[in-house]
């Protein structure tokens, strides 16, 4: 297991690489290039510069999150083949610089959804929350709300240039139901996985967040059955999963422990996001993102990591969203301090699992 932390780049992240390098046990960075629009090829020189910058700080770059998928691919438009070829070229370029895993999602319009990016806990720390009754019927209202609370940073999956076209996007997706989205996903995977096999990269899909339909948009990465379907569409180790414990567990019907154990054992989880959530009494699926420690949330983090360890997990892991604590400000979910605490906690659990096995 290699502990990492997500970093958005020197021009897009308040957290410095030198600060990440000081977090005990963190060996690498999960990187991205924020300003390349979906559908465009990632130039080799940009990838090379990112890798060199990260390695100069004493950290590794083995995972990219994310190479966003153009909506024409998800919708199934005739232009999708052009964007798929661009995606394949990006895969080759990333592999040339030692990238092993690409995390991505296949969600229409919104890459993730929360009702509140500034949810206050009893200790006055700030976190993100999802309360169903607080989600407006008009998607433009949630866009305005998110952009007003983004801390001055572009949020992944909520890039302003893309969301400025949200009305057109909803119109484009109006005839895309779950069956059609699944067909388009299969088309994409069958096209790119041979390239991944050729260059040694694992494409690792992130579960839908939340894992159920919103605004009438379909979801196809929402439960154990969907993950099994994805793995079987192209039966290859290169066709993999980024298991996000918080996202998959947002639906209480999903048994995150069993799902983690099964797909680690099947060697389909090269990368994991590990976070805790706390369900609220206001609704069955209402929750806030809790501190990583088990006692603060609804998930048993030891049980999650034990499922990973016992089934041979040897991939990359990162603490997922953290609270804003100790007066820190910045991109919601991605401050330094609480994620550093989360990384240390997860590393401690892993050390205990290793030593208990000896």
Swiss-Prot record:
<keyword id="KW-0408">Iron</keyword>
<dbReference type="GO" id="GO:0008927">
    <property type="term" value="F:mannonate dehydratase activity"/>
</dbReference>
<comment type="function">
    <text>Catalyzes the dehydration of D-mannonate.</text>
</comment>
<dbReference type="GO" id="GO:0030145">
    <property type="term" value="F:manganese ion binding"/>
</dbReference>
<dbReference type="InterPro" id="IPR036237">
    <property type="entry name" value="Xyl_isomerase-like_sf"/>
</dbReference>
<comment type="pathway">
    <text>Carbohydrate metabolism; pentose and glucuronate interconversion.</text>
</comment>
<protein>
    <recommendedName>
        <fullName>Mannonate dehydratase</fullName>
        <ecNumber>4.2.1.8</ecNumber>
    </recommendedName>
</protein>
<keyword id="KW-0464">Manganese</keyword>
<dbReference type="GO" id="GO:0042840">
    <property type="term" value="P:D-glucuronate catabolic process"/>
</dbReference>
<keyword id="KW-0456">Lyase</keyword>
<comment type="similarity">
    <text>Belongs to the mannonate dehydratase family.</text>
</comment>
<dbReference type="Pfam" id="PF03786">
    <property type="entry name" value="UxuA"/>
</dbReference>
<dbReference type="GO" id="GO:0008198">
    <property type="term" value="F:ferrous iron binding"/>
</dbReference>
<dbReference type="InterPro" id="IPR004628">
    <property type="entry name" value="Man_deHydtase"/>
</dbReference>
């Amino acid at each position: 297991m290699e502990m990492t932390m997500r970093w958005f780049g020197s021009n897009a992240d308040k957290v410095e690489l030198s600060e990440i390098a000081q977090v005990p046990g963190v060996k690498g960075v999960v990187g991205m290039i924020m300003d390349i629009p979906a559908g465009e090829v990632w130039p080799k020189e940009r990838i090379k510069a990112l890798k060199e910058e990260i390695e100069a700080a004493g950290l590794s770059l083995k995972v990219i999150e994310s190479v966003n998928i153009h909506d024409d691919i998800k919708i199934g438009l005739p232009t999708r083949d052009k964007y798929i070829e661009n995606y394949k070229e990006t895969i080759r370029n990333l592999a040339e610089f030692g990238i092993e895993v690409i995390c991505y999602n296949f969600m229409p319009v919104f890459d993730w959804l929360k009702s509140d990016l500034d949810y206050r806990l009893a200790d006055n720390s700030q976190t993100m929350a999802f309360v169903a009754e607080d989600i407006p019927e008009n998607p433009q209202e949630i866009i305005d709300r998110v952009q007003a609370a983004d801390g001055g940073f572009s949020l992944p999956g909520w890039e302003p240039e893309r969301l400025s076209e949200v009305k057109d996007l909803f119109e484009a997706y109006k005839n895309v139901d779950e069956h059609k989205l699944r067909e388009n996903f299969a088309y994409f995977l069958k096209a790119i996985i041979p390239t991944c096999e050729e260059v040694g990269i694992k494409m690792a899909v992130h579960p839908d967040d939340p894992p159920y339909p919103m605004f009438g948009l379909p979801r196809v990465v929402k439960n154990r059955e969907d993950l099994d379907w994805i793995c079987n569409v192209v039966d290859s180790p290169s066709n993999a999963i980024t298991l996000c414990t918080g996202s998959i567990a947002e639906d209480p019907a999903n048994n995150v422990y069993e799902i983690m154990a099964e797909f680690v054992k099947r060697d389909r989880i090269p990368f994991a996001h590990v976070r805790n959530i706390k369900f609220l009494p206001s609704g069955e699926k209402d929750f806030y993102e809790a501190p990583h420690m088990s006692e603060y949330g609804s998930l048993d983090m030891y049980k999650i990591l034990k499922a990973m360890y016992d089934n041979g997990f040897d991939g990359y892991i990162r603490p997922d969203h953290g609270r804003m604590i100790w007066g820190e400000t910045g991109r919601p979910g991605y401050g330094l301090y609480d994620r550093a605490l989360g990384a240390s906690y997860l590393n401690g659990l892993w050390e205990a699992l290793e030593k208990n096995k000896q």
